[in-house]
A protein has these predicted regions:
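Acidic, proline/glycine-rich low-complexity IDRs
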Residues: 1-104
């Protein structure tokens, strides 16, 4: 797994990256595992698995809960999936949005 292209080998590295985001040294943190990831920015928590994206609701998510989710993802124990209510993020192209707008 990686953060900013750096291989992550310990939970401490994840904690430090999240602390940097919480004090404004970075805008977001993405822990990626190939095509899948977990990410956070400004109290938002999202993950991607099997080509689908999800966000934790309701927002904002507390910093401690975000850290717990990142560590769970790193360990591969799946606990983060049970700790939140997840909503699928569905992306629409600009053309689809425009068509809907002009049908009204």
């Amino acid at each position: 797994m990686q953060i900013d292209g750096r291989e992550i080998t310990s939970e401490l590295e994840i904690i430090r990256a999240l602390q940097a985001e919480s004090i404004g040294k970075t805008e977001f943190v993405v822990l990626d595992n190939g095509d899948d990831f977990i990410q956070t920015a400004v109290g938002c928590l999202e993950y991607r698995a099997n080509g689908k994206n999800y966000k934790a609701i309701p927002e904002p998510i507390e910093k401690e809960k975000i850290q717990t989710a990142f560590l769970s993802y790193f360990r591969g124990d799946g606990q983060y999936l049970q700790d939140f209510t997840w909503e699928e993020i569905v992306y629409e192209s600009i053309w689809t949005k425009l068509k809907k707008l002009f049908k009204k």
